[in-house]
């Protein structure tokens, strides 16, 4: 079997990028855990770890500064396709995101992008419905103080 390939597909801006720098640390039928360095260098974001929750439809990432300090947790709402012949995943970013800061503050971001994409036809109504349901499920977990159980899936693979 070939090596697993992961792609990130964005709706805004429209692009599909092979995550060639990502290292898969763990994979089963429920989750994929990766470590990576930033594709496009940014002032603060240097590297991180991500956990794709395949059945739940979100990717939880832990973003770090270059010196190893936690920047924040970043939660993408996603969908995906899988090609078993090529062992390839294409993860589509459904635009709505949640940021959890080290001090506990929570921000839901990019909902305007969801509206813009729906208005322009870049995203389908069904995708928006799917994204909102997944976002609601994730926020319910966060607001009920259960985010630690999600973080454990990722943190056990950090080295």
Which stretches of residues belong to each language-model region?
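Compact, glycine/acidic-enriched structural inserts
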Residues: 1, 100, 115, 121-133
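Charge-rich, low-complexity N-terminal segments
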Residues: 1-48
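Short acidic-glycine loop/turn motifs at beta-strand connectors
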Residues: 27-29, 66-68, 101-103
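Phosphate/ribose-recognition catalytic cores of enzymes acting on nucleotide-derived substrates
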Residues: 46-83, 91-96
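Short C-terminal domain-edge/linker segments immediately following a structured domain
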Residues: 55, 64-68, 105-109, 127-132, ...
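Conserved, surface-exposed functional patches that form binding/active-site neighborhoods
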Residues: 74-121
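Charged phosphate-binding loop/patch that engages nucleotide di/tri-phosphates or the phosphate backbone
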Residues: 131-159
